[in-house]
Amino acid sequence: MKTDIEIAQSVALKPIAEIVEQVGIGFDDIELYGKYKAKLSFDKIEAVRSQKVGKLILVTAINPTPAGEGKSTMSIGLADALNKIGKKTMIALREPSLGPVMGIKGGAAGGGYAQVLPMEDINLHFTGDMHAITTANNALSALLDNHIHQGNELDIDQRRVIWKRVVDLNDRALRQVIVGLGSPVNGIPREDGFDITVASEIMAILCLATDLSDLKKRLSNIVVAYSRDRKPIYVKDLKIEGALTLILKDAIKPNLVQTIYGTPALVHGGPFANIAHGCNSVLATSTALRLADYVVTEAGFGADLGAEKFLDIKTPNLPTSPDAIVIVATLRALKMHGGVSKEDLSQENVEAVKRGFTNLERHVNNMRQYGVPVVVAINQFTADTESEIATLKTLCSNIDVAVELASVWEDGADGGLELAQTVANVIETQSSNYKRLYNDADTIEEKIKKIVTKIYGGNKVHFGPKAQIQLKEFSDNGWDKMPICMAKTQYSFSDNPNLLGAPTDFDITVREFVPKTGAGFIVALTGDVLTMPGLPKKPAALNMDVLEDGTAIGLF
């Protein structure tokens, strides 16, 4: 069987200018990056703002196994299948981070016959958005350190600089560093650190901004440090929001590519869902909704992370809310949640499916709290048995949720036709009555308690010593009315990655808060979640190479 990259390289791509004609985008509306990639112009984005808004489908998943459950693959396959049954559809996805591509994932543009192309470009440098975000982030760091070095007019306490540098790689050695060493001409020595680019607040801002002026306003509101009298220092105090916006003026434009089946795709922005809000850009999703009748988008990791943040953080910034939520599940993941070891997942185990179903059931019930119709998509693997499939279908029927098998990795659009028809029928026959989980007026503690008890199924929330101090500080600064972005392990409903299934009788501890005042949310750090990942013992990079003719190999 061909690998993902072999399948991708076997496809005869059409020029992107030809692909986007089907959704009313002309040649003058795009800025080409070669023949097969383009950015959408500001003029076109503005021109469609008054157009009718289409139907929005959010794809999410159960708590994943370390290998992932094929959520991006399912999103792409579903969109291709919707187009095949006559629904004018676009996809709005995140763009991959190079760190995980070189680390454990080896690629993140879908898989099999459900991919966005050109996958090598998308997985590597694409149109340079990650570079622009990295540059803007580090320009801010350089200008901040220069301000301190050149007299420190704002009286910044260098011990309380909270802005970190970033790089789009998994590099644990950079988590904690000291800058300014050597001599006085090298600046003021201070502790610093690096995050991965997708954890940068500038990434979150780019993905939530609605236009250039909104981008500039959000950048100006970033808190970078505190003064010696404990007052927050903002980017606007440094007077550099204009320069940062300039660096990002092209990166904010959504990227256009295509699927194997020629479905137009907007791939733009890529914050992680365990340490950030996990959704592609508002600008890409909003624009797609005005160009197509149906838009398929996804949120990172499981529904407890990405979907919750999509619904509580991103949706209020969109012109509409989801009309349906598709929860992707695999039998192997359900068996793992049912207590089966990774080595034994290929063996039939109906009882483990029953035990692990509690994880899927909780996610279904959680999404229903938002008032949105739910469909379960079973991502089919060759090791799945008829007995396991029948058991899962019966369990889904018992909780009155629509369920369909899909084999889009192997069969492309044809493998998702039943799923597409079911999703379309649900949208046409059931109304969505979206409501947020919490209100802006709720306190930080109240918002987190609602997430922990209503979504995670936990009992109590404990706040560590630093978090308790920050609660008062954030309230005094007027930051307590913003949404909450939980930073938590993706593998469990709890903050313990080993607590699988649908655990109960557990507490969540928030150890620290990070104000993301430009993005407009507060990050609550739990467990051992890190904002700079490390590489595994055998990184995916070990299998990558390039042939003499420039052909990439080993990208999954």
Swiss-Prot record:
Reaction equations catalysed: (6S)-5,6,7,8-tetrahydrofolate + formate + ATP = (6R)-10-formyltetrahydrofolate + ADP + phosphate
Pathway membership, UniProt: One-carbon metabolism; tetrahydrofolate interconversion
EC number: 6.3.4.3
GO BP term, pick one: tetrahydrofolate interconversion
Enzyme class, UniProt record, top EC level: ligase
Family per similarity comment: Belongs to the formate--tetrahydrofolate ligase family.
Signal peptide segment: none
One Pfam family from the record: FTHFS
Record flagged with keyword Hydrolase: no
Binding site for ATP: 65-72
UniProt keyword DNA-binding present: no
Name of the encoding gene: fhs
UniProt keywords, alphabetically: ATP-binding, Ligase, Nucleotide-binding, One-carbon metabolism
Name listed for the protein in its UniProt record: Formate--tetrahydrofolate ligase
MF terms (GO), sorted A to Z: ATP binding; formate-tetrahydrofolate ligase activity
